[in-house]
Structure formats: structure tokens, C-alpha cells
Amino acid sequence: MLDMTERQVESVLIEIPKGSRNKYEYDKEKKVIKFDRMLFSSMVYPCDYGFFPDTLALDGDPLDALVLTWEPTFPGCVIDVHPVALLDMKDDKGRDEKILCVPETDPLWNYIETLEQVPPHLLKEIVHFFETYKNLEGKHVIVIGWEGLDAAVDMLREAKSRYLEKNK
């Protein structure tokens, strides 16, 4: 269980800014952010999207992060965040968890500590985006649901351990 007197602050590397239809991905070999594709639908990312460096998720990639921002940042931006919740999902490759975070230095969001403090409609928008954004590609995503702070912290801890184990 996380000690709420000390927030867990982590860094996230942003790949895709809020409001973008462009899908960017970090190329591990070239160490650059590359344009992957334009989303096939007219949907846009509901929040900044990136990953936690030096982690390894169950899908073999770094652990995904969703960062609530008032204004979009940019690909390659690093933001200090604290985790709030876990979005549990499955795609064609299997489990695809994402950690919902808020920027540590943004007074519009940094008061949020738990899933229950996130605007409920925003949570619905995020779920709706991930349930439908790949439909026109003929791919489908199953959103299992939201889990709280403890699940997010546990997933982050496991992803860090998995990364360290793989890179001994």
C-alpha cells in the first residue's frame, strides 16, 4: 500500500500530445520519436500519451502513461508526474495497461491523488477513445476498466522490476 504522505513522482516521456490524430512512437534503436501513422478515425487523443522510461510492461514495451494536461505538450517532452489510476485493457497483442497520471507541477491537476478525484466524464471520454480509435483499422480494443492508485503503483513497480531483470 502506498504511503499517501509521500507521493510517488516519476518521469514520463510524451510521444503523443493531447488533441493529436498523429500517432508517434519512440524508436528504441534510433532513439528518436517517429511518426507511426495518422489515426484512421477523426478522433484525437484525450490527453498526453507516453511511457515511463526504464520500465517493461506485459506487452514487451515500456509501460504506457496517460497524462492529464490542460494544454498539450509535445513529442519528446519529459513530465514529472504522480500516478493516480490504472486503465486495464486488452488489444490484439494482449494486455495493454496504462497508468493515468497528473503533472506534479501543474496546479490545475496536481491536487488529484486518486481515481475518485478525476472528473468522471473525462474518465468516460478516455475509455471511449480507447474502445473505438482502432475500429476503422479493423482492430479492436477491450477496455476492462479503471483500477485505483494501489493497482497503478503496483503495476509501475512490477514494470520497473521486469525491466531491471531483463537488462541485468
From Swiss-Prot:
Biological process (GO), any one: phosphate-containing compound metabolic process
As for what it does, the entry says:
Catalyzes the hydrolysis of inorganic pyrophosphate (PPi) forming two phosphate ions.
Oligomeric state and interaction partners are given as: Homohexamer.
Q: Where in the cell is it found?
A: Cytoplasm
The protein's name is: Inorganic pyrophosphatase
Q: Which residues bind Mg(2+) 2?
A: 64
Cofactor(s) recorded in Swiss-Prot or TrEMBL? Mg(2+)
- What cellular component GO annotations does this protein have? cytoplasm
Q: What is its EC number?
A: 3.6.1.1
Q: Which domain of life is it from?
A: Archaea
Record-listed substrate binding positions: 23, 37, 49, 133
Q: Mind telling me which SUPFAM superfamilies this protein's record contains?
A: Inorganic pyrophosphatase (SSF50324)
Q: Keywords for this entry?
A: Cytoplasm, Hydrolase, Magnesium, Metal-binding
Q: Main site of residence?
A: cytoplasm
- MF terms (GO), sorted A to Z: inorganic diphosphate phosphatase activity; magnesium ion binding
Q: What family classification does the UniProt entry report for this protein? A: Belongs to the PPase family.
Catalyzed reaction equations: diphosphate + H2O = 2 phosphate + H(+)
Enzyme class of the recorded protein, top EC level: hydrolase
The protein's matches in Pfam families, at most eight in alphabetical order, are given as:
Pyrophosphatase
Residues given in the record as Mg(2+) 1 binding sites: 59, 64, 96
